């Protein structure tokens, strides 16, 4: 009798995706983040669902309802802390996952990569609207500042902003619709993740060498299920430690003050995972230019396959490209730091140089490094 997991229409899909999936035998721990992102998404949806049962999306009661969750709901404090810090873990895994894709040339699977970039944008949108919901000072002013950026769009800008706000300022209508968006987007993300996996399984996984792995593949289960479970345990331990011992480490103290339209916080800044893009936005004095640079900082990932000039896929055997990659990583850390600093010297100049070098490394230096490495690898007989 044939095994049911290989014949049942639904079980067959699960079997071909997570059990009998032929996987390269040499993929490293950098390939763990896909499964970790899946786990993060499930954790966020579940904790979010329980929070939504007690939350009220009304400007008068939103802040109090969050306080009520933390004080009066059974384990509400834990659910809220896991949800808030789970977002940070989600982005940490996302950035490492994207970084892995850049380093090992995974962007050459164009369909998978493009869906991945759209996923990144959707997750960022979800996190932004979610940050507005507790209706603290930073929630309110963050929403005001970021939505206001759309007014830089010529001709329709102001109308568009008022349409998104549902009035002439960030108010009850804005909070209600942001809650609706925050509720629906994770399920859209879930559907897109399925498409992401569908495209990935059309080609199979890449591997650290960037070479064709078809000659040496092993079943996903038990080898990589065990490996993923190890990564899962480490992630959950980190998340729980963060949520229980220092839940407010990554948050903003201003968000403990209820939203007040008459009082602007001294430094308006988003959560840490948006700071790099925020720094790029602030480094351009022109409003429209800043918005375009902000969009370009993420959308530049879409042209990565076009900028690939090397004959090799992975950076594993390309030391010049490796150096540039780690320079880019350091650059992003600097941008993240600058995004959290006040708009004054020397931070303005550092931010501008870091923004210029971010785009220069990706658009100019990396393709040049690929061409140089190609030249150096050519045999030169006397």
Curated annotation (Swiss-Prot):
Binds 2 heme b groups non-covalently. GO terms for cellular component: mitochondrial inner membrane; respiratory chain complex III. Its cofactor is heme b. Gene3D superfamilies: Cytochrome Bc1 Complex, Chain C. A ubiquinone binds at residue 201. It is found in: Mitochondrion inner membrane. It comes from the Eukaryota. Keywords: Electron transport, Heme, Iron, Membrane, Metal-binding, Mitochondrion, Mitochondrion inner membrane, Respiratory chain, Transmembrane, Transmembrane helix, Transport, Ubiquinone. The chain crosses the membrane at residues 33-53, 77-98, 113-133, 178-198, 226-246, 288-308, 320-340, 347-367. GO terms for molecular function: metal ion binding; ubiquinol-cytochrome-c reductase activity. Its main location: mitochondrion. InterPro entries: Cyt_b/b6_C, Cyt_b/b6_C_sf, Cyt_b/b6_N, Cytb/b6-like_sf, Cytochrome_b, Cytochrome_b_C_euk/bac, Cytochrome_b_N_euk/bac, Di-haem_cyt_TM. Heme b b562 binds at residues 83, 182. Heme b b566 binds at residues 97, 196. It is a multi-pass membrane protein. GO terms for biological process: mitochondrial electron transport, ubiquinol to cytochrome c. The cytochrome bc1 complex contains 11 subunits: 3 respiratory subunits (MT-CYB, CYC1 and UQCRFS1), 2 core proteins (UQCRC1 and UQCRC2) and 6 low-molecular weight proteins (UQCRH/QCR6, UQCRB/QCR7, UQCRQ/QCR8, UQCR10/QCR9, UQCR11/QCR10 and a cleavage product of UQCRFS1). This cytochrome bc1 complex then forms a dimer. Heme 1 (or BL or b562) is low-potential and absorbs at about 562 nm, and heme 2 (or BH or b566) is high-potential and absorbs at about 566 nm. Belongs to the cytochrome b family. Component of the ubiquinol-cytochrome c reductase complex (complex III or cytochrome b-c1 complex) that is part of the mitochondrial respiratory chain. The b-c1 complex mediates electron transfer from ubiquinol to cytochrome c. Contributes to the generation of a proton gradient across the mitochondrial membrane that is then used for ATP synthesis. This is Cytochrome b. The gene is MT-CYB.
């Amino acid at each position: 009798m044939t095994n049911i997991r290989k014949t049942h229409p639904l079980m067959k899909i699960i079997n071909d995706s997570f059990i009998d999936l032929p996987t390269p035998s040499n993929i490293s721990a950098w390939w763990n983040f896909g499964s970790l992102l899946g786990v993060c998404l499930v954790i966020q949806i579940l904790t979010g669902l329980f929070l939504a049962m007690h939350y009220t999306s009304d400007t008068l009661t939103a802040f109090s309802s969050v306080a009520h969750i933390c004080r009066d709901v059974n384990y509400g404090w834990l659910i809220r802390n896991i949800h808030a810090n789970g977002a940070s873990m989600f982005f940490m895994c996302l950035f490492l996952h994207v970084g892995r894709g850049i380093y090992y040339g995974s962007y050459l699977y164009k369909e998978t990569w493009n869906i991945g970039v759209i996923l990144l944008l959707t997750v960022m949108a979800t996190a932004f609207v979610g940050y507005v919901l507790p209706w603290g000072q930073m929630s309110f002013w963050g929403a005001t500042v970021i939505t206001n950026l759309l007014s830089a769009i010529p001709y329709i800008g102001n109308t568009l902003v008022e349409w998104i706000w549902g009035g002439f300022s960030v108010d009850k209508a804005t909070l209600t619709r942001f809650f609706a968006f925050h509720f629906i987007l994770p399920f859209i993300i879930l559907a897109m993740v399925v498409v992401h996996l569908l495209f990935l399984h059309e080609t199979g996984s890449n591997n650290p060498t960037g070479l064709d792995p078809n000659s040496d593949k092993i079943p996903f289960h038990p080898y990589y299920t065990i490996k993923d479970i190890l990564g899962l345990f480490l992630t959950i331990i980190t998340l729980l430690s963060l949520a229980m011992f220092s839940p407010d480490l990554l948050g903003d103290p201003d968000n403990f003050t209820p939203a007040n339209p008459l009082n602007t916080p001294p430094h308006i800044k988003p959560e840490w995972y948006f700071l790099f893009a925020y720094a790029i936005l602030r480094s351009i004095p022109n409003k429209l230019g800043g918005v375009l640079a902000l969009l370009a900082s993420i959308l530049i990932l879409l042209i990565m396959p076009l900028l690939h000039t090397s004959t090799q896929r992975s950076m594993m055997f390309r030391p010049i490209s490796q150096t540039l990659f780690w320079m880019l990583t350091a650059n992003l850390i600097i941008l993240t730091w600058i995004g959290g600093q006040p708009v004054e010297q020397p931070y303005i100049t550092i931010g501008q140089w870091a923004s210029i070098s971010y785009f220069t490394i990706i658009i100019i230096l990396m393709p040049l490094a690929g061409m140089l490495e190609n030249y150096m690898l050519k045999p030169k007989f006397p």
